Amino acid sequence: MSLSILTTQLSFEHDVVLVRQRARQVAKLLGFDAQDQTRIATAVSEIARNALNYGGGGKIEFEVNGKTAPQLMVIRISDRGRGIPNLLEIMEGRYQSRTGMGLGIVGARRLMDQFQIESAPGAGTTVLLKKLLPATADLVSQQRMN
């Protein structure tokens, strides 16, 4: 089961601030403590900024996967940019451009439980940020979200 919570567009600089705030709010709603809320908001902010600055903007989707505990918070950030040419070097921590590109990706990966990135030349980039909901969190269902 995948339950969509929020989808928002990323087009302007103020959208990065907004999506960081939304990430924190969604994390709180899902039962994450203050420290994890900050981790999630920071990871989302880093990837959203990359999507805006290097990918020309895009879309951010928040969802919860799973019917039983532990459920998984999934944040999908996709852009329509040119792709990331040095992805392997970035993921291994061996690459940094003069503008700092690469640090946000590695940092976001460290803040989340699971991290996936797909990028192809001319086809944009999609990043999946995933974090297990806390054991103490109530199960998320369509009924609860209504």
Can you name each region flagged by the protein language model?
Residues 1-42, 141-146:
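Bergerat-fold GHKL ATPase/HATPase_c domain
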Residues 1-6, 48-146:
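Conserved beta-strand-loop-beta-strand hairpin that lines the nucleotide-binding pocket
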